[in-house]
Amino acid sequence: LKDRQAWERAGIALPSYDVEAVMKAGRENPAWVHFGIGNIFRIFLGGIADRLLEAGAIDRGIICVETFDYDVVDKIYDPYDNLALSVILNGDGTVDKKVMGSLAEAIRAKSDDAASWARLKEVFRNPSLQMVSFTITEKGYALCKPDGSYFGFIEADINNGPEKVTSAMSIVASMLLERFRNGAAPISLVSMDNCSHNGELLRSSVITMAEEWLKKGFVEEDYVAYVKDESRVAFPWTMIDKITPRPSEKIANDLEASGLEAMQPVITSKRTYIAPFINAEGPQYLVIEDSFPNGRPELEKGGVYMTDRDTVNKAERMKVTVCLNPIHTALGPYGVLLGYELFPDEMRDEDMLKVAKQVGYVEGMEVVPDPGIISPKAFLDECIYERFPNVYLGDTNLRLCTDSSMGLGVRFGVTIGAYVEKYGDAKKLKAIPLAIAGWLRYTLAIDDQGQSFELAPDPLVEGVREQLSTVVFGDPSSLTDQLRGILSNENIFFIDLYKAGIGEKIEEIFREEIAGVGAVRKTIRKYVSEF
């Protein structure tokens, strides 16, 4: 970074703060630790820290912890001295580029790697630590399979105890034990993943691990009491929003053409798509419940809304159940089926734009909570007219399908439940049943031209495919009762869709969509004409 002019010639802004000093301060007296150090973390939270550093509101960087994909540390953090290049893709085609020096250190959270494990403990012992944030995806908090039994790796972590853990939740519980036994300083654990009541989800999983270890005699009762005491260990709720697609090869090539070296994206062994740069949209929202018993950075100066739990909950419900995520989940699978690689291209399809508007403005807006700090209508307008059509983002429909089964309850089930509460059933809904049928049709992995394609990674999709294994593309009569076990599953949808009055309707749409080549388009057109 010493040759500032070369960077400026390439149109890249550099930090005005002393990067080495900031990293050193972060390592010596950490205030902020983050788990799950991929793209959204680097550009959004790393970006907030970068802004705070530029404003002089903080003086140290974030400690970055990876529990799942260690390639990220080896291929992206270490070789580039923990620097990250932010590339903001504006809707008008302009690009804002900046090097960020806000990431102080990257640690592999491996209990079988003595040096890394000791270092992580050292960080958690330090009373200077105020907050630990998380972007580990919703499945990172899950301890149990859909049937309620523990995953095998969680069972192992319970039986092996705090010193031999492998999963994110067990690692966090183990680090809280280290903090408890070394002064029990207060701390705030902040889930920033895109799921409802994320703080409650994190708290529940960490407490479960603590209680299971207590039963096995690994920990003391006072430790469990510490983890449960929100005046000492807080779990604030949050709402986060910034569309961050996979790194674009085109941007990598443009950066290399401007004089930078080794900018190409890598795909890790765990299928993480990552690069030395992060490309994302400009708009972003982070709403955090202000519950920090050990103090916190002045996050407001980085554009964060600090508020109470009720407001966070409303903002999160607005986004996740109405304005943004349901539209992604409604359109992503159909985009793949209709041959649209890019989501913004699908938004130019008149039929699909109508589906998006029906899901948001009509079906969702009727039951949306208003958080007060952000207008739902203005937020949805920004999504439909500015964010989603931003072709420069290059957001793919396949990315929108990743782990989509985990979000069906939040993104559709909550609204369906609100209709049942309001009207006795959800039969008024038209676009949401169409969306659910489209997701099921997508899981067959045959597009509307009859060509097979590879599904995005998703933990439940294999189970769904097994239940649909006797459904034959081109033969609507092959659908008998295969969908019943899925559509009645409250673990997936939060509600039995037959009891809500729309299970049969979804079956009917799905039956039409498997009729053969072109059936998906024909079916969408038929139902859109009824909106």
How does the language model describe each region?
Residues 1-531:
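Substrate/ligand-engaging "lid" and interaction regions
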